[in-house]
Amino acid sequence: MLNREDSYNIYICGVGGQGIIKTSVIIGEAAMNEGYKVVMSEIHGMSQRGGVVSTELKIGDYKSSTIEKSNADVILSFEPIEAVRALNKANIDTKIVLNTSPIVPSTLNQFNQSYPKVEDIISSLNDNYNFVYPIDGEKLAIESGSLLSLNMVLLGGVIANDTFPLSKKSIIKSMKNNLHSRFHEMNLNAIEKGYDLVKNS
């Protein structure tokens, strides 16, 4: 629950095709259903499959539509290296939820560069931030029924944080309102798997 004068800032990033925009819409609708003001920034980058995408959500009493430097309460990264790129939005107590499955951009091969080891990315984050939650999102999504539920696995991880102002119930209601009924059970399973992983970490 937010105080009237507070805002809660969520930065979501990854690549196109991972469900980033849909995740943002689900959070935003849940916030409005709970009576909060909410604004979602313009999408940066290309939303088609493979292009970098980021959205910024501000819930509550916001002064602008963008998240200022070091002011994110949560960074939700669908791709490990994108979490690193988003760190200008983070402070030491920002909750960082990241998918551990990399999507290696073709540009790395073009310039004979290699993708950093995911373990090194996570280790560096743990050295510098208090709340880092790596999730093998692809594994849990497949266990839930389909890789397409990856975004709901990661969203489940976000809402497990004690400071998250929205209830799991309202997130689930919004998910059901935004996805076809035949996908409800799979995505509910995905939310629960991500939620349980972070709650028990």
What are these regions (language model features)?
Residues 1-201:
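Active-site cofactor/cluster-binding pocket
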